[in-house]
Amino acid sequence: MRPKKTILCVDDNEQILSVRTFLLETRGYRVIAVDNPHHALETISTSLPGTLDLLLCDLIMPQMDGNELVRRAKEIHPGLPAMIISGTVTGYDRAGRADAFLPKGACSPAEVLERVRILVARKRGPRKMSLSARNPSLMTAAATA
C-alpha cells in the first residue's frame, strides 16, 4: 500500500477549511489543516524536507496573504508545490510563486482534486522505468535466448 500524500491546507475560514479537509481525506490524502499562515509556517519549518507534498491555501487571510505564505514556504522547502484558491483574482495575484491558482467558486471539487493530483505527481517526479525500458538490449537478449 502506498503511503498517503500529505497536504498542508490553510484557510482562515473554518467552514471552507473543514470542507476542503473532508474532500481531500475522502480521496485518500492525509491533511494537516491550519487556520492561519503563521501556524502553517511553523508546520513547514518543523517538517523534514519531502514530508509535505503540497501547500494548499487561500489568498486573502489576516496577518499574511497566500502569496507571502507561499514565498516564505518555498524559502524553507524550495521543492514544495503550492496552490492558491481564492475568490479575489487579479493579474498580480496570479503572478505569485504558487504553482497553480484556482478561482474560488469558479472551479468544481473535481477540478481542485485534479490539480492536487497533478501537483503531487509533479513533486514525486517521473515514475521509475522498468529494467527493460531502461536497457532495451536486455529485452532483445531475453527474447532471443
Features from the language model and the residues they span:
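C-terminal output helix
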Residues: 105-120, 124, 128
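Acidic, metal-coordinating helix/loop segments flanking the phosphotransfer/catalytic sites
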Residues: 33-54
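Charged docking surfaces used in two-component/phosphorelay signaling
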Residues: 18-26
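CheY-like receiver
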Residues: 121-145
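Active-site residues of response regulator receiver
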Residues: 58
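Hydrophobic/aromatic residues positioned on beta-strands within the core alpha/beta folds
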Residues: 85-86, 104
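Receiver (REC) domain active-site loop signature in two-component systems and cognate sites
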Residues: 61
